[in-house]
Amino acid sequence: MKNIIRFASLALSVITLLCAVSCGGTEKPAVTTEPTTTEAPASTEPPAPTELVIGENGKSQYTIVYAANEEYGHDTAFYLHRYFREQLKISIDYVKDSERPAEKAEAFEIVVGRTDRDASTAFRKKLKSGEFYIGVEGSSLYIVGRGEEETRAAVEYFIDYIAGTEQKSCKIPADLAFDSGEELSPVLEWEKSKILLSAGGYARMTTLKNGELAVGYSNGGIKFAISTNDGKGWTNTVTVTKPAKTPLGDTLTYANANVIQYGDGDIMVAYRAHSPTNSTKNFYTSIRYQISKDGGKTFGDPVIVVEYQRNDTDFKGFWEPHMVILPDGRLAMYYANDCIGPQDADYPYVPSGSYQHIMVHVFDYETETFDKGTIASNGVDHKSRDGMPVVCNLSDGGLVMVIEANWDKNYAFIIQMLFSEDGINWSDPVTVISPTKKGHYAGAPYVALLPDGRLAVSCQATQYSGATMSSDLVQNSQMNVYISKEPITLANCKDVNEKSFVKVMENPLSMGVETRSIWPAMHVHNGYLICVADIGTNLSTGVTGIYIRRAPIDTIK
Protein backbone atom coordinates (compact mmCIF):
# COMPACT_ATOMS: atom_id res chain seq x y z
CA MET A 1 0.00 0.00 0.00
CA LYS A 2 2.85 2.37 0.86
CA ASN A 3 4.46 1.66 -2.52
CA ILE A 4 1.19 2.50 -4.28
CA ILE A 5 1.01 5.83 -2.46
CA ARG A 6 4.66 6.64 -3.25
CA PHE A 7 4.07 5.78 -6.93
CA ALA A 8 1.00 8.02 -7.06
CA SER A 9 2.93 10.88 -5.47
CA LEU A 10 5.80 10.48 -7.93
CA ALA A 11 3.44 10.39 -10.89
CA LEU A 12 1.72 13.56 -9.65
CA SER A 13 5.10 15.31 -9.31
CA VAL A 14 6.05 14.40 -12.89
CA ILE A 15 2.73 15.65 -14.23
CA THR A 16 3.13 18.92 -12.33
CA LEU A 17 6.65 19.41 -13.65
CA LEU A 18 5.58 18.73 -17.25
CA CYS A 19 2.72 21.24 -16.87
CA ALA A 20 5.11 23.85 -15.52
CA VAL A 21 7.50 23.35 -18.44
CA SER A 22 4.79 23.44 -21.04
CA CYS A 23 3.17 26.55 -19.53
CA GLY A 24 6.25 28.49 -18.47
CA GLY A 25 9.25 27.12 -20.41
CA THR A 26 12.34 26.35 -18.38
CA GLU A 27 12.15 29.48 -16.24
CA LYS A 28 11.80 28.97 -12.54
CA PRO A 29 8.45 30.07 -11.17
CA ALA A 30 8.56 33.28 -9.23
CA VAL A 31 8.62 32.91 -5.50
CA THR A 32 6.80 35.36 -3.26
CA THR A 33 6.40 35.64 0.42
CA GLU A 34 3.21 37.77 0.16
CA PRO A 35 0.15 36.01 1.51
CA THR A 36 -2.27 34.85 -1.15
CA THR A 37 -5.95 35.84 -1.04
CA THR A 38 -8.84 34.01 -2.49
CA GLU A 39 -12.08 35.80 -3.51
CA ALA A 40 -15.10 34.57 -1.68
CA PRO A 41 -17.43 32.58 -3.85
CA ALA A 42 -20.56 34.41 -5.06
CA SER A 43 -23.50 34.18 -2.69
CA THR A 44 -25.76 31.26 -3.34
CA GLU A 45 -28.73 32.80 -1.44
CA PRO A 46 -31.85 33.11 -3.64
CA PRO A 47 -32.88 36.65 -4.65
CA ALA A 48 -35.69 38.30 -2.74
CA PRO A 49 -39.09 37.30 -4.15
CA THR A 50 -40.70 39.84 -6.45
CA GLU A 51 -44.23 38.67 -5.79
CA LEU A 52 -46.40 37.11 -3.12
CA VAL A 53 -48.20 34.01 -4.27
CA ILE A 54 -51.55 34.27 -2.52
CA GLY A 55 -52.95 31.32 -4.40
CA GLU A 56 -51.78 28.83 -6.98
CA ASN A 57 -53.46 25.81 -8.54
CA GLY A 58 -56.58 26.64 -6.57
CA LYS A 59 -54.85 26.36 -3.18
CA SER A 60 -53.49 28.91 -0.71
CA GLN A 61 -51.32 28.85 2.37
CA TYR A 62 -52.82 32.18 3.42
CA THR A 63 -55.52 32.84 6.00
CA ILE A 64 -57.78 35.90 6.05
CA VAL A 65 -57.66 37.49 9.51
CA TYR A 66 -60.32 40.03 10.51
CA ALA A 67 -60.96 42.16 13.58
CA ALA A 68 -63.25 40.51 16.10
CA ASN A 69 -64.20 43.90 17.58
CA GLU A 70 -65.43 45.44 14.30
CA GLU A 71 -69.17 45.40 13.67
CA TYR A 72 -68.85 44.43 10.02
CA GLY A 73 -65.46 42.71 10.23
CA HIS A 74 -66.86 39.25 9.59
CA ASP A 75 -68.96 40.43 6.63
CA THR A 76 -65.99 42.12 4.98
CA ALA A 77 -63.74 39.08 5.47
CA PHE A 78 -66.46 36.80 4.16
CA TYR A 79 -66.85 39.06 1.12
CA LEU A 80 -63.14 38.66 0.33
CA HIS A 81 -63.24 34.95 1.11
CA ARG A 82 -66.17 34.51 -1.25
CA TYR A 83 -64.36 36.38 -4.01
CA PHE A 84 -61.41 34.01 -3.76
CA ARG A 85 -63.69 30.99 -3.63
CA GLU A 86 -66.28 31.88 -6.28
CA GLN A 87 -64.41 34.13 -8.70
CA LEU A 88 -60.80 32.94 -8.50
CA LYS A 89 -61.62 29.36 -7.48
CA ILE A 90 -59.04 29.50 -4.67
CA SER A 91 -59.67 27.74 -1.38
CA ILE A 92 -58.81 30.08 1.49
CA ASP A 93 -59.93 30.18 5.12
CA TYR A 94 -60.83 33.17 7.30
CA VAL A 95 -60.74 33.63 11.08
CA LYS A 96 -61.03 36.46 13.56
CA ASP A 97 -57.87 37.74 15.20
CA SER A 98 -58.89 36.46 18.63
CA GLU A 99 -58.85 32.93 17.22
CA ARG A 100 -55.36 33.45 15.84
CA PRO A 101 -53.65 35.71 18.42
CA ALA A 102 -50.90 37.99 17.22
CA GLU A 103 -48.28 36.48 19.49
CA LYS A 104 -48.98 33.04 18.01
CA ALA A 105 -49.67 34.16 14.49
CA GLU A 106 -47.55 32.82 11.72
CA ALA A 107 -46.78 34.44 8.41
CA PHE A 108 -48.97 34.18 5.33
CA GLU A 109 -51.91 36.24 6.52
CA ILE A 110 -54.29 38.56 4.70
CA VAL A 111 -55.02 40.99 7.50
CA VAL A 112 -58.27 42.93 7.05
CA GLY A 113 -59.24 45.93 9.16
CA ARG A 114 -58.43 47.04 12.68
CA THR A 115 -56.95 43.82 14.00
CA ASP A 116 -54.57 43.33 16.93
CA ARG A 117 -51.60 43.09 14.55
CA ASP A 118 -48.98 45.78 15.16
CA ALA A 119 -48.73 46.56 11.46
CA SER A 120 -52.50 47.16 11.29
CA THR A 121 -52.21 49.75 14.03
CA ALA A 122 -49.19 51.40 12.43
CA PHE A 123 -50.88 51.69 9.04
CA ARG A 124 -54.13 53.06 10.51
CA LYS A 125 -52.33 55.82 12.39
CA LYS A 126 -51.11 57.25 9.08
CA LEU A 127 -54.57 57.33 7.51
CA LYS A 128 -57.13 60.12 7.48
CA SER A 129 -60.89 59.79 7.28
CA GLY A 130 -61.86 58.29 3.94
CA GLU A 131 -58.44 56.72 3.29
CA PHE A 132 -57.15 53.16 3.18
CA TYR A 133 -53.88 51.28 2.73
CA ILE A 134 -53.09 48.03 0.91
CA GLY A 135 -49.55 46.77 1.36
CA VAL A 136 -47.20 43.88 1.98
CA GLU A 137 -45.28 43.48 5.22
CA GLY A 138 -43.01 40.44 5.23
CA SER A 139 -45.05 37.60 3.82
CA SER A 140 -48.40 39.04 4.88
CA LEU A 141 -50.83 41.32 3.05
CA TYR A 142 -52.56 44.15 4.93
CA ILE A 143 -55.85 45.68 3.79
CA VAL A 144 -56.61 48.43 6.26
CA GLY A 145 -58.91 51.45 6.32
CA ARG A 146 -59.17 54.32 8.72
CA GLY A 147 -62.57 52.96 9.69
CA GLU A 148 -64.71 49.99 8.78
CA GLU A 149 -66.20 51.60 5.70
CA GLU A 150 -62.77 52.55 4.41
CA THR A 151 -61.64 48.96 4.97
CA ARG A 152 -64.55 47.75 2.90
CA ALA A 153 -63.58 50.20 0.15
CA ALA A 154 -60.03 48.86 0.36
CA VAL A 155 -61.23 45.29 -0.11
CA GLU A 156 -63.27 46.37 -3.12
CA TYR A 157 -60.26 48.16 -4.58
CA PHE A 158 -58.05 45.12 -4.01
CA ILE A 159 -60.56 42.91 -5.82
CA ASP A 160 -61.09 45.27 -8.75
CA TYR A 161 -57.56 46.47 -9.39
CA ILE A 162 -54.98 44.23 -7.70
CA ALA A 163 -56.15 40.64 -7.24
CA GLY A 164 -56.61 39.94 -10.93
CA THR A 165 -59.09 37.64 -12.63
CA GLU A 166 -57.03 34.54 -13.42
CA GLN A 167 -58.79 31.53 -11.97
CA LYS A 168 -56.97 29.35 -9.43
CA SER A 169 -54.14 31.91 -9.17
CA CYS A 170 -53.48 35.17 -7.36
CA LYS A 171 -50.09 36.85 -7.29
CA ILE A 172 -49.31 40.37 -6.11
CA PRO A 173 -46.11 42.47 -6.05
CA ALA A 174 -43.95 41.78 -3.00
CA ASP A 175 -43.33 45.52 -2.62
CA LEU A 176 -47.01 46.50 -2.87
CA ALA A 177 -47.70 49.69 -0.90
CA PHE A 178 -50.87 51.48 -2.03
CA ASP A 179 -52.06 54.53 -0.04
CA SER A 180 -55.42 55.79 -1.32
CA GLY A 181 -54.78 59.22 0.16
CA GLU A 182 -51.73 59.62 -2.06
CA GLU A 183 -52.94 57.73 -5.12
CA LEU A 184 -56.66 58.42 -5.36
CA SER A 185 -58.81 61.50 -5.59
CA PRO A 186 -61.31 62.81 -4.88
CA VAL A 187 -61.62 62.14 -1.18
CA LEU A 188 -64.81 63.02 0.63
CA GLU A 189 -64.91 63.18 4.38
CA TRP A 190 -68.33 61.72 4.98
CA GLU A 191 -69.77 62.56 8.34
CA LYS A 192 -69.77 59.55 10.62
CA SER A 193 -73.50 59.43 11.27
CA LYS A 194 -76.12 58.14 8.86
CA ILE A 195 -79.42 59.88 9.49
CA LEU A 196 -82.71 58.00 9.30
CA LEU A 197 -85.22 60.11 7.42
CA SER A 198 -88.19 57.75 7.42
CA ALA A 199 -89.43 54.37 6.44
CA GLY A 200 -90.33 54.17 2.78
CA GLY A 201 -88.26 54.83 -0.31
CA TYR A 202 -87.18 56.93 -3.31
CA ALA A 203 -86.45 60.28 -1.66
CA ARG A 204 -85.64 63.46 -3.64
CA MET A 205 -84.58 66.81 -2.13
CA THR A 206 -84.61 70.50 -3.00
CA THR A 207 -83.68 73.75 -1.26
CA LEU A 208 -86.54 76.17 -0.70
CA LYS A 209 -86.26 79.93 -1.15
CA ASN A 210 -86.27 80.41 2.65
CA GLY A 211 -83.18 78.18 2.97
CA GLU A 212 -84.99 75.15 4.32
CA LEU A 213 -84.39 71.67 2.91
CA ALA A 214 -87.44 69.88 1.51
CA VAL A 215 -87.90 66.24 0.56
CA GLY A 216 -90.50 64.14 -1.21
CA TYR A 217 -90.66 60.36 -0.82
CA SER A 218 -93.08 57.44 -0.86
CA ASN A 219 -94.31 55.72 2.28
CA GLY A 220 -97.93 54.65 2.09
CA GLY A 221 -98.48 57.47 -0.39
CA ILE A 222 -96.37 60.46 -1.36
CA LYS A 223 -94.94 62.38 1.61
CA PHE A 224 -93.45 65.87 1.87
CA ALA A 225 -91.29 67.03 4.78
CA ILE A 226 -89.09 69.98 5.83
CA SER A 227 -85.70 70.16 7.55
CA THR A 228 -84.46 73.35 9.20
CA ASN A 229 -81.10 71.87 10.24
CA ASP A 230 -79.63 70.70 6.92
CA GLY A 231 -81.15 67.23 6.99
CA LYS A 232 -80.43 66.21 10.58
CA GLY A 233 -84.12 66.20 11.48
CA TRP A 234 -87.41 66.39 9.61
CA THR A 235 -90.70 67.99 10.63
CA ASN A 236 -94.06 69.09 9.22
CA THR A 237 -94.53 65.85 7.32
CA VAL A 238 -97.53 66.03 5.01
CA THR A 239 -99.19 63.25 3.03
CA VAL A 240 -99.62 64.75 -0.43
CA THR A 241 -101.69 62.02 -2.07
CA LYS A 242 -104.99 60.47 -1.07
CA PRO A 243 -106.12 56.89 -1.65
CA ALA A 244 -107.75 56.62 -5.07
CA LYS A 245 -108.73 54.14 -7.74
CA THR A 246 -107.52 53.66 -11.28
CA PRO A 247 -110.10 53.88 -14.07
CA LEU A 248 -110.08 50.09 -13.90
CA GLY A 249 -111.05 50.02 -10.24
CA ASP A 250 -107.64 49.03 -8.83
CA THR A 251 -106.13 50.96 -5.94
CA LEU A 252 -103.59 53.49 -7.26
CA THR A 253 -99.95 52.91 -6.34
CA TYR A 254 -97.85 56.08 -5.83
CA ALA A 255 -94.06 56.31 -6.16
CA ASN A 256 -91.10 58.29 -7.59
CA ALA A 257 -91.74 61.61 -5.84
CA ASN A 258 -89.89 64.72 -7.04
CA VAL A 259 -90.03 68.22 -5.57
CA ILE A 260 -89.39 71.72 -6.94
CA GLN A 261 -90.18 75.30 -5.90
CA TYR A 262 -90.82 77.91 -8.56
CA GLY A 263 -92.16 81.41 -9.18
CA ASP A 264 -93.17 83.26 -6.04
CA GLY A 265 -92.82 80.18 -3.87
CA ASP A 266 -95.29 77.57 -5.06
CA ILE A 267 -94.09 74.01 -4.43
CA MET A 268 -94.80 71.22 -6.90
CA VAL A 269 -94.60 67.52 -6.09
CA ALA A 270 -94.70 65.17 -9.09
CA TYR A 271 -94.96 61.38 -8.99
CA ARG A 272 -96.12 58.34 -10.89
CA ALA A 273 -99.52 56.77 -10.21
CA HIS A 274 -100.37 53.37 -11.67
CA SER A 275 -101.98 49.99 -11.20
CA PRO A 276 -100.49 47.76 -8.51
CA THR A 277 -97.82 45.31 -9.63
CA ASN A 278 -100.11 42.34 -8.93
CA SER A 279 -102.98 43.70 -10.99
CA THR A 280 -104.94 41.05 -12.86
CA LYS A 281 -106.75 43.68 -14.89
CA ASN A 282 -105.47 45.91 -17.67
CA PHE A 283 -102.55 48.11 -16.67
CA TYR A 284 -103.08 51.83 -15.97
CA THR A 285 -100.14 54.26 -15.80
CA SER A 286 -99.81 58.02 -15.32
CA ILE A 287 -97.59 60.93 -14.26
CA ARG A 288 -99.26 63.44 -11.93
CA TYR A 289 -98.43 66.51 -9.86
CA GLN A 290 -99.88 68.54 -7.03
CA ILE A 291 -99.15 72.15 -6.07
CA SER A 292 -98.84 73.77 -2.64
CA LYS A 293 -99.34 77.53 -2.34
CA ASP A 294 -98.73 77.70 1.41
CA GLY A 295 -95.16 76.47 1.74
CA GLY A 296 -95.96 72.76 1.76
CA LYS A 297 -98.63 72.74 4.46
CA THR A 298 -101.36 71.64 2.06
CA PHE A 299 -101.48 70.49 -1.56
CA GLY A 300 -104.14 70.91 -4.23
CA ASP A 301 -105.83 68.20 -6.24
CA PRO A 302 -103.75 65.99 -8.55
CA VAL A 303 -103.32 67.03 -12.18
CA ILE A 304 -102.48 64.45 -14.84
CA VAL A 305 -99.57 65.16 -17.21
CA VAL A 306 -99.92 61.93 -19.19
CA GLU A 307 -101.84 58.68 -18.73
CA TYR A 308 -102.49 55.47 -20.61
CA GLN A 309 -104.48 52.29 -20.12
CA ARG A 310 -102.96 49.16 -21.60
CA ASN A 311 -104.90 46.14 -22.78
CA ASP A 312 -102.73 43.75 -20.78
CA THR A 313 -101.00 43.61 -17.40
CA ASP A 314 -97.45 44.14 -18.70
CA PHE A 315 -95.65 46.49 -16.29
CA LYS A 316 -94.82 49.18 -18.86
CA GLY A 317 -95.69 52.86 -18.58
CA PHE A 318 -94.42 56.22 -17.29
CA TRP A 319 -91.74 56.48 -14.59
CA GLU A 320 -89.49 58.71 -12.47
CA PRO A 321 -90.50 62.33 -13.12
CA HIS A 322 -87.79 64.92 -12.53
CA MET A 323 -88.20 68.70 -12.65
CA VAL A 324 -85.79 71.60 -13.24
CA ILE A 325 -85.90 75.32 -13.99
CA LEU A 326 -84.60 75.93 -17.52
CA PRO A 327 -82.15 78.73 -18.39
CA ASP A 328 -85.04 80.85 -19.73
CA GLY A 329 -86.93 80.53 -16.43
CA ARG A 330 -89.49 77.96 -17.54
CA LEU A 331 -90.16 74.80 -15.54
CA ALA A 332 -89.61 71.48 -17.32
CA MET A 333 -90.53 67.95 -16.33
CA TYR A 334 -88.66 64.89 -17.61
CA TYR A 335 -89.69 61.26 -17.21
CA ALA A 336 -89.08 57.81 -18.70
CA ASN A 337 -91.62 56.38 -21.13
CA ASP A 338 -91.67 52.69 -22.03
CA CYS A 339 -95.40 52.71 -22.61
CA ILE A 340 -96.16 50.45 -25.56
CA GLY A 341 -98.87 52.01 -27.68
CA PRO A 342 -100.06 52.79 -31.19
CA GLN A 343 -97.27 54.11 -33.40
CA ASP A 344 -99.65 56.40 -35.31
CA ALA A 345 -100.79 58.25 -32.16
CA ASP A 346 -99.95 61.90 -31.47
CA TYR A 347 -97.85 60.74 -28.48
CA PRO A 348 -94.54 58.88 -28.98
CA TYR A 349 -95.27 55.47 -27.50
CA VAL A 350 -92.50 52.90 -27.91
CA PRO A 351 -92.97 49.94 -30.28
CA SER A 352 -91.81 47.34 -27.73
CA GLY A 353 -90.39 46.92 -24.26
CA SER A 354 -86.88 46.85 -25.70
CA TYR A 355 -86.97 50.65 -25.93
CA GLN A 356 -87.63 53.57 -23.63
CA HIS A 357 -87.77 57.30 -24.35
CA ILE A 358 -86.97 60.24 -22.11
CA MET A 359 -89.78 62.78 -22.42
CA VAL A 360 -89.80 66.50 -21.61
CA HIS A 361 -92.85 68.70 -20.94
CA VAL A 362 -92.81 72.47 -20.27
CA PHE A 363 -95.06 74.06 -17.64
CA ASP A 364 -97.34 77.03 -18.32
CA TYR A 365 -97.29 79.25 -15.24
CA GLU A 366 -100.64 80.88 -16.07
CA THR A 367 -102.70 77.75 -16.71
CA GLU A 368 -100.58 75.62 -14.34
CA THR A 369 -100.53 72.80 -16.88
CA PHE A 370 -97.84 71.09 -18.94
CA ASP A 371 -97.69 70.97 -22.73
CA LYS A 372 -98.01 67.79 -24.84
CA GLY A 373 -94.30 67.07 -24.53
CA THR A 374 -91.58 65.88 -26.85
CA ILE A 375 -88.78 63.32 -26.86
CA ALA A 376 -85.58 64.49 -25.16
CA SER A 377 -83.65 61.21 -25.61
CA ASN A 378 -84.87 58.73 -28.21
CA GLY A 379 -84.50 55.14 -27.04
CA VAL A 380 -85.48 53.75 -30.43
CA ASP A 381 -82.71 55.71 -32.14
CA HIS A 382 -80.25 54.68 -29.43
CA LYS A 383 -81.48 51.05 -29.44
CA SER A 384 -81.75 51.36 -25.68
CA ARG A 385 -84.05 51.63 -22.72
CA ASP A 386 -82.97 55.18 -21.86
CA GLY A 387 -84.33 55.68 -18.34
CA MET A 388 -84.41 57.44 -14.99
CA PRO A 389 -83.52 60.97 -16.18
CA VAL A 390 -82.06 63.57 -13.84
CA VAL A 391 -81.21 67.08 -15.06
CA CYS A 392 -79.24 69.88 -13.44
CA ASN A 393 -77.86 73.25 -14.47
CA LEU A 394 -74.22 73.73 -15.42
CA SER A 395 -72.12 76.63 -14.18
CA ASP A 396 -72.16 78.35 -17.60
CA GLY A 397 -75.94 78.25 -18.04
CA GLY A 398 -76.25 74.97 -19.92
CA LEU A 399 -77.88 71.77 -18.74
CA VAL A 400 -76.71 68.20 -18.19
CA MET A 401 -78.83 65.06 -18.06
CA VAL A 402 -77.86 61.63 -16.77
CA ILE A 403 -79.71 58.47 -17.77
CA GLU A 404 -79.32 54.73 -17.48
CA ALA A 405 -79.00 52.87 -20.78
CA ASN A 406 -78.70 49.25 -21.87
CA TRP A 407 -77.50 49.38 -25.47
CA ASP A 408 -74.06 48.05 -24.49
CA LYS A 409 -74.55 44.29 -24.38
CA ASN A 410 -71.49 43.83 -22.16
CA TYR A 411 -73.40 45.26 -19.20
CA ALA A 412 -76.91 45.13 -17.80
CA PHE A 413 -76.97 48.97 -17.65
CA ILE A 414 -74.50 51.85 -17.93
CA ILE A 415 -74.69 55.56 -17.06
CA GLN A 416 -74.74 58.09 -19.88
CA MET A 417 -74.71 61.89 -20.04
CA LEU A 418 -76.36 64.36 -22.44
CA PHE A 419 -76.01 68.14 -22.76
CA SER A 420 -78.35 70.94 -23.83
CA GLU A 421 -78.49 74.73 -24.17
CA ASP A 422 -82.27 74.99 -23.72
CA GLY A 423 -83.39 71.75 -22.03
CA ILE A 424 -85.47 70.70 -25.03
CA ASN A 425 -82.88 69.74 -27.64
CA TRP A 426 -80.21 67.37 -26.36
CA SER A 427 -76.89 65.99 -27.56
CA ASP A 428 -76.25 62.35 -28.24
CA PRO A 429 -75.51 60.46 -25.01
CA VAL A 430 -71.95 59.62 -23.97
CA THR A 431 -70.98 56.94 -21.47
CA VAL A 432 -69.56 58.25 -18.19
CA ILE A 433 -69.86 55.20 -15.91
CA SER A 434 -69.81 51.52 -16.79
CA PRO A 435 -69.34 48.57 -14.43
CA THR A 436 -65.86 47.16 -13.96
CA LYS A 437 -67.06 43.65 -14.76
CA LYS A 438 -69.03 42.32 -17.70
CA GLY A 439 -72.62 41.46 -16.96
CA HIS A 440 -72.80 43.86 -14.04
CA TYR A 441 -75.16 46.76 -13.58
CA ALA A 442 -74.89 50.52 -13.01
CA GLY A 443 -78.25 52.31 -13.00
CA ALA A 444 -80.51 54.84 -11.29
CA PRO A 445 -78.17 57.82 -11.84
CA TYR A 446 -78.23 61.26 -10.26
CA VAL A 447 -76.21 64.42 -10.96
CA ALA A 448 -75.53 67.54 -8.88
CA LEU A 449 -73.52 70.69 -9.58
CA LEU A 450 -70.76 71.45 -7.07
CA PRO A 451 -69.88 75.08 -6.25
CA ASP A 452 -66.59 74.90 -8.19
CA GLY A 453 -68.31 73.78 -11.41
CA ARG A 454 -67.48 70.10 -11.10
CA LEU A 455 -70.24 67.51 -11.25
CA ALA A 456 -71.07 64.84 -8.70
CA VAL A 457 -72.68 61.76 -10.25
CA SER A 458 -74.17 58.87 -8.32
CA CYS A 459 -75.65 55.53 -9.29
CA GLN A 460 -76.50 52.17 -7.83
CA ALA A 461 -74.11 49.49 -9.00
CA THR A 462 -73.50 45.80 -8.46
CA GLN A 463 -69.73 45.92 -8.94
CA TYR A 464 -69.37 47.53 -5.50
CA SER A 465 -71.95 45.39 -3.73
CA GLY A 466 -71.12 42.53 -1.44
CA ALA A 467 -74.27 40.62 -2.21
CA THR A 468 -74.21 37.30 -3.93
CA MET A 469 -75.09 37.92 -7.54
CA SER A 470 -78.60 36.88 -8.53
CA SER A 471 -81.14 37.71 -11.19
CA ASP A 472 -82.27 40.77 -9.22
CA LEU A 473 -79.51 43.29 -9.88
CA VAL A 474 -81.25 46.12 -8.03
CA GLN A 475 -81.38 44.26 -4.74
CA ASN A 476 -77.64 43.59 -5.06
CA SER A 477 -76.65 47.24 -5.53
CA GLN A 478 -74.86 49.90 -3.51
CA MET A 479 -74.88 53.68 -3.97
CA ASN A 480 -71.65 54.88 -5.64
CA VAL A 481 -70.49 58.50 -5.97
CA TYR A 482 -68.20 59.92 -8.66
CA ILE A 483 -66.70 63.42 -8.96
CA SER A 484 -65.55 64.99 -12.22
CA LYS A 485 -61.86 65.86 -12.33
CA GLU A 486 -62.55 69.30 -13.81
CA PRO A 487 -65.51 71.68 -14.08
CA ILE A 488 -67.86 70.58 -16.87
CA THR A 489 -69.53 73.17 -19.10
CA LEU A 490 -71.12 73.41 -22.53
CA ALA A 491 -67.75 74.64 -23.79
CA ASN A 492 -65.93 71.40 -22.91
CA CYS A 493 -68.78 68.88 -22.80
CA LYS A 494 -67.68 67.26 -26.07
CA ASP A 495 -64.58 66.02 -24.27
CA VAL A 496 -66.50 64.30 -21.46
CA ASN A 497 -66.09 60.52 -21.13
CA GLU A 498 -65.51 57.87 -18.48
CA LYS A 499 -62.03 59.21 -17.76
CA SER A 500 -63.57 62.54 -16.76
CA PHE A 501 -64.83 61.06 -13.47
CA VAL A 502 -63.19 59.44 -10.46
CA LYS A 503 -65.02 57.23 -8.00
CA VAL A 504 -65.15 58.20 -4.34
CA MET A 505 -63.88 54.93 -2.91
CA GLU A 506 -66.01 54.94 0.22
CA ASN A 507 -69.64 54.28 -0.60
CA PRO A 508 -71.69 56.73 1.48
CA LEU A 509 -74.63 54.57 2.52
CA SER A 510 -73.34 51.07 3.15
CA MET A 511 -74.33 49.37 6.39
CA GLY A 512 -72.29 46.24 6.01
CA VAL A 513 -71.31 44.10 3.09
CA GLU A 514 -74.69 42.39 2.81
CA THR A 515 -76.83 45.52 2.61
CA ARG A 516 -78.15 47.44 -0.36
CA SER A 517 -78.48 51.20 -0.86
CA ILE A 518 -80.74 51.86 -3.83
CA TRP A 519 -82.69 54.58 -5.66
CA PRO A 520 -80.04 57.09 -4.57
CA ALA A 521 -80.07 60.86 -4.97
CA MET A 522 -77.81 63.80 -4.09
CA HIS A 523 -78.35 67.45 -3.32
CA VAL A 524 -75.97 70.34 -2.67
CA HIS A 525 -77.30 72.36 0.26
CA ASN A 526 -75.78 74.91 2.60
CA GLY A 527 -72.19 73.70 2.25
CA TYR A 528 -72.97 69.98 2.15
CA LEU A 529 -73.21 67.29 -0.48
CA ILE A 530 -76.14 65.30 0.88
CA CYS A 531 -76.70 61.72 -0.24
CA VAL A 532 -79.92 59.78 0.30
CA ALA A 533 -80.91 56.20 -0.52
CA ASP A 534 -83.10 53.31 0.57
CA ILE A 535 -81.12 50.93 2.78
CA GLY A 536 -82.11 47.33 3.31
CA THR A 537 -80.80 43.79 3.47
CA ASN A 538 -79.55 42.39 0.20
CA LEU A 539 -81.51 39.66 -1.50
CA SER A 540 -84.71 40.53 0.36
CA THR A 541 -87.57 42.93 -0.21
CA GLY A 542 -87.70 44.39 3.29
CA VAL A 543 -86.38 47.96 3.43
CA THR A 544 -84.74 49.24 6.59
CA GLY A 545 -85.52 52.83 5.68
CA ILE A 546 -84.44 56.00 3.92
CA TYR A 547 -81.07 57.22 5.18
CA ILE A 548 -79.08 60.40 4.63
CA ARG A 549 -75.36 61.02 4.85
CA ARG A 550 -73.57 64.32 4.41
CA ALA A 551 -70.10 65.41 3.31
CA PRO A 552 -68.89 68.99 3.79
CA ILE A 553 -68.24 70.47 0.37
CA ASP A 554 -64.88 71.88 1.45
CA THR A 555 -63.55 68.32 2.07
CA ILE A 556 -63.81 67.44 -1.63
CA LYS A 557 -60.39 67.51 -3.20
Locations of the language-model features?
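Sec-dependent signal peptide cleavage junction
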Residues: L18-T38
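Secreted/extracellular small peptides and ectodomain modules produced from precursors
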Residues: L17, V21, K168, A332-M333, ...
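N-terminal secretory signal peptides that target proteins for export/translocation
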Residues: M1-N3
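Sec-dependent N-terminal signal peptides of Gram-positive bacterial secreted proteins and lipoproteins
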Residues: I5-G25
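Solvent-exposed alpha-helical segments and adjacent loops
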Residues: T36-L184
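Short Gly/charged-rich anion-binding patches and loops
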Residues: A11, Y79, I287
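Asp-box/BNR beta-propeller blade signature and adjacent active/binding-site loops
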Residues: G181-K557
